[in-house]
From Swiss-Prot:
Places the protein is found: Secreted
Main function: Snaclec that induces platelet aggregation without any cofactor in a dose-dependent manner. Its platelet aggregation effect is blocked by echicetin, suggesting it is a GPIb-binding protein which binds to the same or a closely related GPIb site on platelets as echicetin.
Statement: the UniProt record of this protein carries the keyword Disulfide bond: yes
SMART domains in UniProt: CLECT
The species this protein was found in: Trimeresurus purpureomaculatus
Record GO terms (molecular function): toxin activity
Expressed in which tissues: Expressed by the venom gland.
Pfam families: Lectin_C (PF00059)
GO BP term, example: venom-mediated platelet aggregation
Quaternary organization: Homodimer (non-covalently linked) of heterodimer of alpha and beta subunits (disulfide-linked).
Stated name of the protein: Snaclec purpureotin subunit beta
Amino acid sequence: DCPSDWSSYDLYCYKVFQQRMNWEDAEKFCRQQHTGSHLLSFHSSEEVDFVVSKTLPILKADFVWIGLTDVWSACRLQWSDGTELKYNAWTAESECIASKTTDNQWWTRSCSRTYPFVCKLEV
């Protein structure tokens, strides 16, 4: 069973938090709520529809943090001519992913920006 103020879908519980935090603080906050709780992860379009039905009425049109970060670190980047990336001019800020509550488009955002968020807990 889900905690009393969490919503249930499939084998998971969800809670929308309106307070705005940066990505790291939001993930830490989720972990403090319950053992096994983290920022939201999506595994099906049906799950997305459920989450949108919960977040949109509360947050209106806004972004929420989801549990993706540093997507580029897993990529082996190279130039279009096939040469290896040895020089780069990336900003020092790490990128995290926020989901738009209106249509579930995922956007890279600076991890230091503050957004509301959704915590997810496996039952």
